[in-house]
Curated annotation (Swiss-Prot):
This is Urease subunit beta. It is an enzyme of class 3 (hydrolase). CDD domains: Urease_beta. The lineage of its organism: Bacteria, Pseudomonadati, Pseudomonadota, Alphaproteobacteria, Rhodobacterales. GO terms for biological process: urea catabolic process. It holds the Pfam family Urease_beta. The gene is ureB.
Length: 101
């Protein structure tokens, strides 16, 4: 083995395959772009984003870690969300949960 060498797995790797998923329509009703990162608790995003926040409780974007989705002013798009795993506790963000989901 060489330091830093990577041994990739064979075949396709499916991200979030076993997690509960939901698809929501999201509109940016604001006058500025809103960008949401991959692991942000989607129900607590910017209030300018219009969508079913209760359906998004305990969910995050189903995109690769470290990436984000940008919503331009007036833009409407569908997004797929996946449930948080592990202890299913949410702290920080906008402070609306601060504990178990």
């Amino acid at each position: 083995m060489i330091p830093g060498e990577i041994f990739p797995a064979e075949g396709e790797i499916l991200l979030n395959a076993e997690r509960m998923q939901v698809t929501l329509v999201v509109s940016n009703a604001g006058d500025r772009p809103v960008q949401v990162g991959s692991h942000y608790h989607f129900a607590e995003t910017n209030p300018a984003l219009d969508f079913d926040r209760e359906a998004a409780r305990g969910m995050r974007l189903d995109i690769p870690a470290g990436t984000a989705v940008r919503f331009e002013p007036g833009q409407t798009r569908e997004v797929r969300l996946v449930s948080y795993a592990g202890a299913r506790e949410v702290y920080g963000f906008n402070g609306r949960i601060m504990g178990k989901l």
